[in-house]
Amino acid sequence: MTRDFSKFEQNLTHLDSEGAVKMVDVSTKVQTIRQAEAAGQVRMLPETFEAIQRGNSPKGDVLGTAKLAGIMAAKQTAQLIPLCHPLPLQKIDIELIPDPHLPGYQIRAMVKTKAETGVEMEALTAVSVAALTLYDMAKALEKSISIELIRLLSKSGGKSGDYMVK
């Protein structure tokens, strides 16, 4: 039985009329300023949080390393996610915000480009890898660290318009 995917083509842009995956052709799109912000959190025991805050981790600079990893990951998104376009990124900002109420860290990433397609995946990848790196750097202190609530907060630019989480 052959399935007709043509009616889905407009909504499912990464599928062709036969249902096979494809990379979207953005060659006719106009370059515009695109920006996306993503967030996540890393929860840990109070003792682990305090050790990181004091700089007492056996692996060294936990927060600095996680920040650099997030920046590097945003730049490598097209290598990690098969149908993402490689983009020239003009700005990547990563914040690891101490949150004693979790306890742990809120992670935020903002990515900006002037391109034909958006940077949502780059922002989400930056947060994800920063969180994974924080875990890796702190796992000698605690194995039960939890990575939570990775999500897109906002995006601007492009034909689909702006988005902001409610």
From Swiss-Prot:
Keywords: Lyase, Molybdenum cofactor biosynthesis. InterPro entries: MoaC, MoaC_bact/euk, MoaC_sf, MoCo_biosynth_MoaA/MoaC, Mopterin_CF_biosynth-C_dom. The active site is at residue 136. It is an enzyme of class 4 (lyase). Coiled coil: none annotated. Its EC number is 4.6.1.17. Pathway: Cofactor biosynthesis; molybdopterin biosynthesis. GO terms for molecular function: cyclic pyranopterin monophosphate synthase activity. Transmembrane segments: none annotated. It comes from the Bacteria. Substrate binds at residues 83-85, 121-122. One of its GO terms (biological process) is Mo-molybdopterin cofactor biosynthetic process. Pfam families: MoaC (PF01967). It catalyses: (8S)-3',8-cyclo-7,8-dihydroguanosine 5'-triphosphate = cyclic pyranopterin phosphate + diphosphate. Homohexamer; trimer of dimers. Belongs to the MoaC family. Catalyzes the conversion of (8S)-3',8-cyclo-7,8-dihydroguanosine 5'-triphosphate to cyclic pyranopterin monophosphate (cPMP). This is Cyclic pyranopterin monophosphate synthase. The lineage of its organism: Bacteria, Bacillati, Cyanobacteriota, Cyanophyceae, Oscillatoriophycideae. The gene is moaC.
